[in-house]
Curated annotation (Swiss-Prot):
This is tRNA sulfurtransferase. Keywords: ATP-binding, Cytoplasm, Disulfide bond, Nucleotide-binding, Redox-active center, RNA-binding, Thiamine biosynthesis, Transferase, tRNA-binding. It catalyses: [ThiI sulfur-carrier protein]-S-sulfanyl-L-cysteine + a uridine in tRNA + 2 reduced [2Fe-2S]-[ferredoxin] + ATP + H(+) = [ThiI sulfur-carrier protein]-L-cysteine + a 4-thiouridine in tRNA + 2 oxidized [2Fe-2S]-[ferredoxin] + AMP + diphosphate; [ThiS sulfur-carrier protein]-C-terminal Gly-Gly-AMP + S-sulfanyl-L-cysteinyl-[cysteine desulfurase] + AH2 = [ThiS sulfur-carrier protein]-C-terminal-Gly-aminoethanethioate + L-cysteinyl-[cysteine desulfurase] + A + AMP + 2 H(+). ATP binds at L185, I186, K267, G289, Q298. Pathway: Cofactor biosynthesis; thiamine diphosphate biosynthesis. The keyword Nucleotide-binding applies. Disulfide bonds join C346-C458. It is found in: Cytoplasm. Catalyzes the ATP-dependent transfer of a sulfur to tRNA to produce 4-thiouridine in position 8 of tRNAs, which functions as a near-UV photosensor. Also catalyzes the transfer of sulfur to the sulfur carrier protein ThiS, forming ThiS-thiocarboxylate. This is a step in the synthesis of thiazole, in the thiamine biosynthesis pathway. The sulfur is donated as persulfide by IscS. GO terms for biological process: thiamine biosynthetic process; thiamine diphosphate biosynthetic process; thiazole biosynthetic process; tRNA 4-thiouridine biosynthesis. SUPFAM superfamilies: Adenine nucleotide alpha hydrolases-like, Rhodanese/Cell cycle control phosphatase, THUMP domain-like.
């Protein structure tokens, strides 16, 4: 079984040299992602497409490959195909007949062909010949060119015939690392998750900077969001997760800064701290989830004052999006339920925030602030490769027991994503297994029977351990990690 990866149209519009560079990078990215699924995956780059070969002895990997390819930036769509050789137009029909005979029985159909290469026929010739043959020699209701029940999709490339099994919509955008790196200021809320995704999709290697205002529980929740975004959409490249202990900064702002200016000052201090981190790693821009008028600090006047705190470019991909549109996007990318369970800390420090900050007044207030405190908190920041979150979880799950056997009365919660759980459901004799995806567990766990003990399960143990840590931080003691 093969997949034909079609490049995003914007890539095809580039000059030859740029298109070749982008295509090479996409090929490498696909290989990096799929080798984590199976080392036997083969990836071949052609002029306008990339061919992915599923190991012939592992057809069960088709669905996994399809899921991964659908989330790699730079892909317009993917078609899963069966490959055949042919020597004539009749040979094409003879191979299509047994393939589609049962599928089109009792239904209307049409044939659509895409062809490239040198042949003594064109695409329309094939559509007519194959369509006519299927119409005469099957029990189909007939040909219907508009809105048929079944569309027979064929692709021809030189002497190869590809019968399309299914079409998978791609992510679009540009291949990862075709653009410069960015540093996303992530809080775990709706906005920062979506803004991070937007730059991953656009081909920028997106690192994460987290200003910790809420302790270990807050950090665990944000790490889940960042790890999810990286694992699902950016796994081809390693990125950094930087955690900055910002409680001392908030404490000093509360003590020294005028109440109305607190929100703007906090954002300016965050930008200066993030700039220091970005400069250290050669990152050229900051990304925030700010949206015009959403909160008091996000008026044009205040955003202008915030921008004056740094010379580094600040990018705001959500600036004109409505809140509901942002929430809808977070639902699509899988961060909505994370965001629901993570409180917004920045908004609680200013009771009467200004919406028209004056730069001179803000700068005067900042004279009360210890500038070297920024250097101290940045120096104490914890920087980690996001891939090491798994190892960190293995070390930190000390308060949560890890078990390989299920005791009487214990319930397993399968926290895998729905498509993974459906593909290979966890079935254990005489044991209740509840399927609650990891991104819903934080909001649904409180509704479960508190007298029961719950064992969290996922394939690799990363999300189950993250969720266990998060629940322990919330005060739950009836949770363990299940690693059979």
């Amino acid at each position: 079984m093969k997949f034909i990866v079609k490049l995003y149209p914007e890539i095809m519009m580039k000059s030859k040299s740029v298109r070749m560079r982008f295509t090479k990078m996409l090929e490498t990215n696909i290989r990096n992602v799929l080798k984590n699924v199976d080392e036997g995956a083969k990836v071949q780059r052609l002029y306008d497409r990339i061919i992915v070969q599923v190991p012939s002895d592992k057809p069960e990997l088709c669905d996994v490959f399809a899921d991964r390819l659908a989330c790699i930036p730079g892909i317009a769509h993917v078609v899963q195909v069966s490959e055949y050789s042919f020597d004539s137009i009749d040979h094409i029909y003879q191979q299509a007949l047994p393939k589609y005979r049962d599928e089109i029985a009792g239904k209307t159909f049409c044939v659509r062909v895409k062809r490239s290469g040198n042949h003594d026929f064109n695409s329309i010739d094939v559509e007519r010949y194959v369509g006519g043959g299927l119409n005469q020699h099957t029990e189909a209701l007939g040909v219907k060119l508009k809105d048929p029940d079944v569309t027979v999709n064929l692709e021809i490339n030189q002497d190869k015939l590809y019968m399309v099994e299914r079409r998978i919509q791609g992510l679009g955008g540009f291949p990862m690392a075709t653009q410069e790196d960015v540093l996303s200021l992530i809080s775990g809320g709706f906005d920062s998750g979506v803004s991070s995704f937007q730059f991953i999709k656009k081909g920028a290697r997106t690192h994460y900077c987290f200003f910790n205002l809420g302790g270990a529980q807050h950090e665990i929740g944000v790490k889940q969001v960042a790890y999810h975004l990286w694992k699902k959409y950016g796994e081809s490249h390693k990125v950094r997760f930087v955690s900055v202990p910002f409680e001392p900064v908030v404490e000093e702002i509360l003590e020294r800064i005028d109440n109305g200016q607190m929100g703007v000052v906090l954002k300016r201090v965050m930008m200066r701290a993030a700039t220091r981190i970005a400069d250290k790693y050669g990152i050229q821009a900051l990304v925030t989830g700010e949206s015009l008028g959403q909160v008091s600090s996000q008026t044009l006047t205040n955003l202008n004052v915030i921008d004056r705190s740094t010379d580094l470019l600040i990018l705001r991909p959500l600036i004109a999006m409505d809140k509901q549109d942002i929430i809808n996007q977070s639902r699509i990318i899988g961060t909505e339920d994370f965001a629901k369970s993570i409180p917004e800390y920045c908004g609680v420090i200013s009771q009467k925030p200004t919406v028209k900050a004056v730069l001179s007044k803000v700068e005067a207030e900042e004279l009360k602030f210890s500038e070297d405190l920024i250097d101290r908190v940045v120096a104490s920041a914890v920087v980690m490769d996001i891939r090491d979150i798994e190892a960190e979880m293995n070390q930190q799950v000390t308060e949560t027991e890890t078990v390989k056997d299920v005791a009487s009365g214990e319930i397993i919660i399968d926290v895998r994503a729905p498509e993974e759980e459906e593909r290979s459901p966890l079935l254990i004799d005489n044991v209740m297994v509840k399927a609650i995806p990891f991104f819903k567990l934080a909001t649904q766990f409180a509704d479960l029977d508190k007298s029961k003990t719950y064992l969290l399960y996922c394939d690799r143990g990363v999300m189950s351990k993250l969720q266990a840590l998060y629940l322990v931080e919330q005060g739950y003691t009836n949770v363990k990690v299940y690693r059979p």
